[in-house]
A protein has these predicted regions:
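Bacterial N-terminal signal peptides
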Residues: 1-2
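N-terminal alpha-helical modules
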Residues: 5-154
């Protein structure tokens, strides 16, 4: 019931964040591939076997983790490109290109995930697939930007 739902969303805490953080640290150390870390917070979420609302909340909680990480990596990359753009006297404005690319990616993610939702004609399964799409695409974009950052720092 509602009480259980309230409890499960409160349990989205440092514990579940630590689950992904530890997984990513292992991945960085070469112990696993970082893609295997996606869904870790969801798996640890008490509501993941509950109602649609509880499941979507669990997915949304993890999406918030990836979204915060995405914003952080994006800002770091903008800073790197801003420095690099000022070092070179060419016409490559990588800050603007990254911004355009990110805007395009957001548009693509929203369209793709809306499709994942609409495919089930707005039913409960659509809410889950739509939310899962947002989570997995956001995590995937984090990895893409982390790779770009690694290259840009060379």
């Amino acid at each position: 019931g509602p009480a259980a739902f309230g409890q499960s969303s409160e349990l989205e805490s440092e514990d579940s964040t630590a689950t992904i953080e530890n997984c990513l640290a292992e991945a960085e150390a070469g112990g696993r591939n970082r893609e295997s870390c996606v869904g870790r917070m969801y798996d640890a979420c008490p509501g993941n076997a509950g109602s649609t609302l509880e499941m979507v909340t669990c997915i949304t909680n993890e999406t918030a983790f990836w979204d915060a990480r995405l914003n952080e990596v994006y800002r770091e990359l903008i800073d790197i490109y801003r420095r690099r753009d000022s070092e070179f006297s060419d016409d490559y404005n990588m800050v603007a290109r990254l911004r355009d690319t990110q805007r395009g990616w957001i548009e693509w993610r929203d369209l793709k995930c809306r499709f994942a939702y609409d495919e089930f004609r707005g039913g409960t399964l659509g809410r889950i697939t739509g939310a899962d799409c947002m989570m997995s695409m956001t995590a995937e974009r984090v990895f893409e930007l982390e790779d770009l950052k690694e290259t840009a720092e060379m």
